[in-house]
Amino acid sequence: MNINNYTIKSQEALQQAVELTRRHGQQAIEPQHLLKAVMDQGESLTDFLFAKMGLNKGSIATAVDKLIEKLPHVSGGEPYLSHETNQVLQAAEDAAHRMKDKYVSLEHIVLAILTTRCEASTLLKDAGATEQLLQSAIEELRKGRNVTSQSAEEQYNALEKYAVNLCQRARDGKLDPVIGRDDEIRRVLQILSRRTKNNPILIGEPGVGKTAIAEGLAYRIVRGDVPENLRNKQIFSLDMGALIAGAKYKGEFEERLKAVVNEVTGAEGEIILFIDEIHTLVGAGKSEGAMDAANILKPALARGELRAIGATTLDEYRKYFEKDKALERRFQMVMVDEPDELSSISILRGLKEKYENHHKVRIKDDAIIAAVKLSHRYITERFLPDKAIDLMDEAAARLRMEVDSLPEELDEISRRIKQLEIEREAIKRENDEEKVQFLDREIAELKEKEASEKAQWQNEKDRINQIQQLKIDIEELKFQADRAEREGDYGRVAEIRYGLIKQKETEIDTIQQQLHELQRGGSMIKEEVEADDIADIVSRWTGIPVSRMLQSERDKLLHLEDELHKRVIGQDEAIRAVADAVRRSRAGLQDPKRPIGSFIFLGTTGVGKTELARALAELLFDDESMLTRIDMSEYQEKFSATRLIGAPPGYVGYDEGGQLTEAIRRKPYSVVLFDEIEKAHPDVFNVLLQVLDDGRLTDNKGHVVNFKNTLIIMTSNLGSDIIRERMQNLTAENRRSLTARTADEVMQLLKHTIRPEFLNRIDETIVFTPLTEKEIYEIVRLQLDGIVRQLADNDVVLHYTEAVVTFAAREGYDPQFGARPVKRVLQRFVLNELSKALLADTVDSTRPVLIDCIDGSIVFRNE
């Protein structure tokens, strides 16, 4: 016996037989050990052979285990081949020689076990196996091919192992219905009907429905809705994962693929191969001196012997196919474009029933429309209908979780009962009978209410589940009716459609009526997916608030100016302009093709330009970190403009992406602050033109980043000299006229500095006026209140007098520098001195501390 004359699977079976013998504490390797090992190693092979002979593999496996258990147990010694096993292996080699095979494979061993006198042979014969049946099963398995390689078993029934029959899945009702795409399917049918180069390749963005077209074609073939030359054809979808998985040895992957190709070509045009993600074949299996998988397919594709439908994305087609012209010309392109909103709504309506039956909830039509419209507007990096289907699916899954969970009001009652029971046990120890009786009454009332509501919840849930089960039954009946219609059993079709289905629909109406009666006093279960549910999922995915506004948010938006004035003193015009832009956005009245708003804030330093942007971020998102700040002083060189969108290919930092584009991809709903824009190189403004006009920017990798939900604020100190000069005599009375004249001069300067095409795209340019002394007083109070809150976190109570406010305002008032000197004054005279006093224990931090100003000096004392 030469082990090299055995296939890899046969060698592994022999090795497993040795291990099996050792594990059972036996010495002689008997034919039953070998049969058990062959059944484990060649699972799909023995499944096929036993099925063709009409044997039950499960019962044979059990019987073999019993035979092995009966064998004598011996301790010590190495396992050896028994006389019967040697005879079996010799018979297997003879069978291989007789069949003109180069190697002994698993089917030779099964045949040898059956024809050799041994217990394993008797077991197989008792189960109904005969040599003649096994020989015909082997012939059917091999389809006229001989064993010429050591991985021969991998090539048997290659289509069953490495592909999925889409037509069979369509017959079994396991594919989702395909709605629309008639033009693309018709074009695919035309190409498939050609004599040569009859291989369509579906090219489109991810999620537009390329695979669905192949499934739609399978449905049409099953229904007979195809030209005569394509009737009764089978579509097999190649599973690349199964093809590659377990291919340990060099050339094994190619052998598997060649076996698939041989099986398809051997069917003489009856099988169409669908290869999803076909670009993975280009380069697959390629190693030193070997050709890749695509080259194995080329000859059969060119001759028209192999009909294949490919599917890939535009990027992959460009990357792999266009480089290989020989492969490209063998496929005919079919472009699959993203469907428009109306087509996507039709697709979702067609899929609705499948998702309703899966999640056991109802999906309203307005939810479908919302899924398409909201996904199209807010989820920009993905494509319809895939993103809309995902929204509908997730909203239904979320609702199903709520249906299965205990309602919130019931959960609260249950928690309240537990809390009261704990209180009652505590009061019992104090012998307070009156309180115990009061708690008992309250617990009894709550338990009665809980039982009543729980019963209603359970009844509603049962009715909803009954309705959904009946709908699943109706779907199964429709599938049976379609199958009966294909088979020509029209009596059965009539019985199902006009008898059984009508009966189920009547049952649904009855249960629906019962459910309405139960819910008359109020429903405990929400069973319908609505537009608000879809909007909520969009908000969770993107962070963009598209759900219906609560009353509290409406009030906040209506009084946005007041909220902003709590942090930004003065600058009424700027606050009004920004608040109007935010209100337009949340009311859904903004231009959907542009950002929420774009503003240039001009003014001297320290007047609140950057602070307004920070306040806005905190107010809108409850978090200042939602402010994306780009300091334009870092973009003074010509080449630095690329940092916004990312370095071009070949340059350092290409993989990192752009500072602006990456920030907005992660936080699409945010405030973008370009600080001190006059310091940036003019080329930077060219990058921002399409952001302001179209609300989009393409990064260095070709990804389109959506700016339509951002608020863009640019600040500049341009014209600050003019503002300081004109505003020296600023008073509350002449403020309006002086501001208007100054703004005109600053705008003229701005027009000379920044290009007109950039300025023309800005919504509003606002000049911030220098702060008056009265406003400085308010800022001091604001800063002192901040210090009070900061110390309160450290358990120190702080109060201040009006004299401190007056002192800090006078010391910190400088029209040239705005509010920043105030911060420095408070730091020097208040924070520094207070920290010394607290550390030196000259004031007691456990008692309230008062800050006062006496004779021009800040003093601290305990109240």
Swiss-Prot record:
Where does the chain bind ATP 2? 603-610
Any keyword Cytoplasm? yes
Q: Which GO terms describe its molecular function?
A: ATP binding; ATP hydrolysis activity
Which residues does the annotated region (NBD1) include?
157-338
Tell me, in one coarse class, where this protein mainly resides. cytoplasm
Stretches for region Repeat 1 = 6-71
Q: Where is this region: Repeat 2?
A: 81-144
Tell me where it resides: Cytoplasm
Q: Where is this region: Linker?
A: 339-543
One Pfam family hit: Clp_N
Q: Where is the stretch described as C-terminal?
A: 771-863
A GO cellular component term found in this entry reads: cytoplasm
Region NBD2, as annotated, extends over 553-770
What does the record list as coiled-coil region(s)? 389-520
Write out the residues that bind ATP 1: 204-211
Q: Where is the Clp R domain?
A: 3-144
- Name the Gene Ontology biological process terms: cellular response to heat; protein refolding
Q: Would I find Coiled coil among this entry's keywords?
A: yes
InterPro entries per the record? AAA+_ATPase (IPR003593), ATPase_AAA_core (IPR003959), Chaperonin_ClpB (IPR017730), Clp_ATPase_C (IPR019489), Clp_N_dom_sf (IPR036628), Clp_R_dom (IPR004176), ClpA/B (IPR001270), ClpA/B_CS1 (IPR018368)
Q: What does this protein do?
A: Part of a stress-induced multi-chaperone system, it is involved in the recovery of the cell from heat-induced damage, in cooperation with DnaK, DnaJ and GrpE. Acts before DnaK, in the processing of protein aggregates. Protein binding stimulates the ATPase activity; ATP hydrolysis unfolds the denatured protein aggregates, which probably helps expose new hydrophobic binding sites on the surface of ClpB-bound aggregates, contributing to the solubilization and refolding of denatured protein aggregates by DnaK.
The cross-references to PANTHER family, in alphabetical order and at most eight, read: ATP-DEPENDENT CLP PROTEASE, HEAT SHOCK PROTEIN 104
What family does the entry list? Answer: Belongs to the ClpA/ClpB family.
Oligomeric form and interacting partners = Homohexamer. The oligomerization is ATP-dependent.
Name by which UniProt lists this protein: Chaperone protein ClpB
